[in-house]
Structure formats: structure tokens, C-alpha cells
């Protein structure tokens, strides 16, 4: 095995596959990519409708869970992370949400200089191949294919949800990834010709064809090799044997918001007390490693449907067989979508500059494991506040890389977070009570109309909320004078040369949306920084903000 490379990347996930492609693209640099998981060539990964299978599989995901969460009455929440080529982009729901422009301006305000929206937009566009073609906001010839699924044509409930939002006094938006995030409209997904567009399919497939690129799967990375606070390589286990490889230029951790923290701490980089408690010799005391952990929570707000038009009628094995057969033969139909084809982003109160609540609409009533919630037809919205105040941490518990780390999000630990949830439940109920839903809406299944007071909502949320699987921000970028900043604005680990982190852990704050799109953008921009390329010129595109955001929660008056 070749031992020396210009760049070594740990983790073939949403960011690692992008870096593998971009760093090997010129042919001038040798690149090694190490991945713990294996092949992504499974129908359960590639067929969009099968998304619940890989996420709940030991084969394709690290099945982490949180420590007992005090403000969820001691519940432990599921926290799966991709362990397969493509990482979490191969097991996620394929929802493509960049986040609001103000999220990235917030990053810069928090000390990540050069990561404002004007600087990030060109990299979102470079990554993307939007099915409707390039415009000022969308990319038209990038590796990552995005589309709107079946464009809401296969179920009238998608449009009814958008109409209900308008009747409740909210705007409609034709493209939440473009000029206007706020409002109700169609939802976008990373799907190409009916197949999941993971970063493995979009980026890694290109790198694999190059002689200067090497991929090794089934690897457990033990630690980053350090010489006098300089990263020189990695030590890893392959087929039961310890091996080392060396990096001439840089080692890059793209192991995700849990994995990158583990790797830094196992290598002696992190809070001194955490390292010593785990039996790891501290090399460099960096107190922010594993801190600032953030996530999105969500609930399934469910109703019976009065018409037999929902996906609940397609969950028997015969129907699944027909859907699968059509997909195998044509790559079309109900197998070719994640079924989230309409959505919304709203503000929960006046005085918020940009949305903090997100809706995914699903024409089915399902449980978290993908099974039917009950006999009969129903629909649901996945909803939750997206700008939590609560902050958590990730800590290794031993020097063994296979020991699961301690993960504590401290969900709902602030009064603001709890109030956001009360607002969220009440606003959702109001939206779904609008006239556009009348012909479809049956009884409220959950929360149930008996959940109405603050105390009742608080208790129901504690018992029913789940992670949206968006752990992030645990190795944040920040300014030199921020003692908790793990990275500088070029994703370089403070105090250690030739070492970067590039994945969702670098975010200073969690954006208002799903994480895959901004993680890919971060990797695109980081690739230019790593290669010392001139960054793409900033793009001064306008962004819509509600004209009366300081005094009004929404732009119009509700019909009901």
C-alpha cells in the first residue's frame, strides 16, 4: 500500500466526497480518502422512497444515541450518522435546503470571517445542477442534481397545504432556496433521474476514475499522527491490522459533527479534562472541541384524512412491490421521491428577521420507523423550531475509537426554546384548520385537541419530540479572540498546523434548514482555501425579508 499522499481525508460523507473530487481534480495532488463504512450500491440507499431503511441500519449508519436528556424527562434520542460511501447524504431524507441568507451573515458575525451569504452563494451555485436550470440563485451545471420530485402532481394534499398557509396569512414562495425563503411552496430534493443524488454519486464517482486518488473502505481511524503540533498522517485499522499513512500537505477530518470531535479528542486535541478522563494524553488543550453542539428537534403533527388518497394506502407489501418494480424499470413514480414535496418556513413571532420554523409536508401518517401510524388514511407535517438556544457537547469516554462517545444536546434547556415549541404547535394547528384543508382534514391524531395549554404542550413535546438528525457546530469556526473557536475562518485547527476540519461541525450556528446543502457548500469553499485558489467573487444578490418583520409575525391576516 502506498504510504505517502499530499492530502488525507477522513470520512467519505457529505463533505469528504466533495473534497476528494475537488482536491484530486487537477491531477496534481495525490489524495487518500478513508471511510469506515462500505459500498452504497444498495436499492435501499439509491431508491428515494426507501429512505427509512438505511438510517435505521447498523450496516449503513453509526447508531448513536444521546445521554439521558434532562428536559425531555430523561429520554435518550436516536442520533444516526452515515457509515457508508456518501455518509449521511446516503441515509438522509434527501431534502435540499440551503438555509436562510441571514444564517450565513450570522456565521460571519460570530467570527467566521468571509462566510457571509454573498461569499457562500457562489459555492451553493457551483455545487448545484438544478433541474429548472441556472439563474441568479441556482446552479445549472454542478455535480449535485436537485429537483422538486414529482412536482406535487401525484397528490392534491401538497397544494392544499400551500393554500392553507396562504389562507393563514403567510406568503407563497416559488423558490425557498432563491430570493425568498419565507413562506409556503414546493420542496426540493437531491434526486437525479429518480435516484438519490448523494455526494458519493455526485462527486466521489468522478474522483474514483483518477489515478491520483485512492479510496480505502472499512477503515477505523485511530488517531491523527502529530509531530510537534503538526499533523503528519493518520493511524488506522484495516482488516485487524494497524497501519499508517502520511500526508505531505494536510490531514482533513470530514468525519461529521460526532466523528470529527471523536478523532480530534482521540488524537489529544480538545478539553484537557475530557482527554485525561478518557485516558488520552493531551497534546493541545483546545476547550471548544465537542462544545457548542446544536441540533433540530421535530414532531409529527398528524391528522386523519377523509379521502383515501394518502400513502397509507401504499404501505402493504403488494403495493410496495409495485412501486419498487416501477422504480427498477423506469426510475419513476412513487419510488422516485422522498414524498416531501411541499414545505414552509415561517417566523414564530414578530421581531424575528428571518424564519425559525420549518415544515415538511407528507401525504401519509407514519411512525419514526417508517411504519403506518394507524389503520386508515392520514397526513402529517414534520415541524419544529430551527434556531434553538440550547447547546450541548460531545466527549469521548475512552481511547478506543469504537466506544460510542457521550452525546448531550441539552434539548429544550432554555425558556425561549420551550416557548418556541408552544408557538410552533399553536401556529401549526391554526394553519391546518384553514379552509383549503377542509375536504381532507379529519380528526387531529396528535398532539390531539386536548393538548392546548402551555403545560399540556410542554409535556406532549417532552414525550414525543425526536431529533431531525441535524447534529452540528461542535468544532466551530470563530475569531482569534474566541476561546471556544476550534477553527479559524479557513477551517484550520487552532494550534495545530496542516490539520483542518471540513463538515457540519464547523458551523458556528445551526442554519434554518436541513444540513446537507450547507455542508456541501462548506466543502466546496474549503477546497478552494485548501488549494490556495482565489475564492469565487462574492455575489450581491437581493434577499427578501418581510417588510414588517419587526412588528408583525406574518404578512397577512388569517381567514380563520
From Swiss-Prot:
Active site (record annotation): 470
Reactions catalysed: choline + A = betaine aldehyde + AH2; betaine aldehyde + NAD(+) + H2O = glycine betaine + NADH + 2 H(+)
Record pathway: Amine and polyamine biosynthesis; betaine biosynthesis via choline pathway; betaine aldehyde from choline (cytochrome c reductase route): step 1/1
GO biological process: glycine betaine biosynthetic process from choline
UniProt-annotated binding residues for FAD: 6-35
GO molecular function: betaine-aldehyde dehydrogenase (NAD+) activity; choline dehydrogenase activity; flavin adenine dinucleotide binding
Family as reported in the entry's similarity comment: Belongs to the GMC oxidoreductase family.
Stored PANTHER family: CHOLINE DEHYDROGENASE, MITOCHONDRIAL, GLUCOSE-METHANOL-CHOLINE GMC OXIDOREDUCTASE
Name assigned to this protein: Oxygen-dependent choline dehydrogenase
Organism: Vibrio vulnificus (strain YJ016)
Upper lineage: Bacteria, Pseudomonadati, Pseudomonadota, Gammaproteobacteria, Vibrionales
Gene name, Swiss-Prot/TrEMBL: betA
